[in-house]
Amino acid sequence: MININDRALIKKAIDKINKLAEKIDKLKIMHVCGSHEHTICKYGIRDVLPENITVVPGPGCPVCVTTQKEIDTAIYLADNGYVITTLGDMYRVPGSEKSLMEKQSEGCDVRIVYSISEAVKMAKKERDKKFVFVAIGFETTAPTTGAELISLKNKDVNNFFILNCHRQTPPVMEFLLNEGVYLDAFICPGHVSTITGLKPYYGLCEKYKAPMVVAGFEPIDVLMAIIMILKQVISGEAKVENEYIRAVKPEGNVLAQKIINEVFESIDVPWRGFPVVKNGGFGLREKYKKFDIYEHEDIPEIKEKIPKGCICDKILRGEKLPTDCPLFGTVCTPLNPVGSCMVSDEGTCRIFYKYRRI
């Protein structure tokens, strides 16, 4: 068995990248996974790449791509008597005026939970209160939400709803290829691909002639993905490959896919930093819409207020890096986040802040 942390193997991979890079002009690769950015920053992978190879972070953080309007909706519901249950990262994301953490300090009932199941247990125990779970995440977390709603479908629980913020990754990849910054290739997300398998990438790869490699999260995984992309570019190919074979099956997690297809359907939704992304969201199917808070409340239109100087939108689209932001590390820090990219552990700005100071 290969030791994925073997330093000699890593050095060999870096040497291989440098040798292959001599055969091309320029190559711009995007990844769409916060865990990949952790690996790239922690181990200084960008520093060892030749100048003609660029790897940029994309919209790989579910907290970061949740829109300000969705945060404001949760705050509106908290102001109107709902118990808001949320994962820890969402608790601190700024809305147009305040965050859920600030609303809690003002007396609103906002609770941090570790899962949707914990929120459901609270709702069952406190029947006199109305609960909303802020459901975020990509294909990796949508099955958990779906499974919980399936189990609740025929049960007498009428005080539990979700604020559905789930999103799909391949559609935003297509948006970036079609309308975003110029990209040559993608390092596809490892966690998402354990659920989806390789199928969602085939159409994109064929349509846009962009190499796509699913990668794991060790330094050697990322380096090998770059090598695989380079080999495709040099040979004039564009195909989907799986570097992360120890975790990702070509067919993905079929059971999780069945749960997603049972509960959700594809819908067009905006992402933070993006306009409406075609099929970019998971909408609840008709038979599960009783859990959709939008079916029970008429949410007023709240105008977004982007903080002056914040470039989270450009960072999420791969147009800029955190170090290009005038607020980074001064006005905007993990203790005082101005934009969503500084809040979550998966956020690009948070990751840059953590590892650029080692």
Curated annotation (Swiss-Prot):
**Binding of Fe cation, residues:** 33, 61, 64
Which InterPro entries does its entry note? Hyd_form_HypD, HypD_1, HypD_2_sf
Q: Which Gene3D superfamilies match?
A: 6.10.20.100, HypD, alpha/beta domain 1
Pfam name, any one: HypD
Recorded hits in PANTHER family, A to Z, give:
HYDROGENASE MATURATION FACTOR HYPD, HYDROGENASE PROTEIN ASSEMBLY PROTEIN HYPD
User: Which family does the UniProt entry place this protein in?
Assistant: Belongs to the HypD family.
This one is known as Putative hydrogenase expression/formation protein MJ0993
Organism equals Methanocaldococcus jannaschii (strain ATCC 43067 / DSM 2661 / JAL-1 / JCM 10045 / NBRC 100440) (Methanococcus jannaschii)
Specify the taxonomic lineage: Archaea, Methanobacteriati, Methanobacteriota, Methanomada group, Methanococci
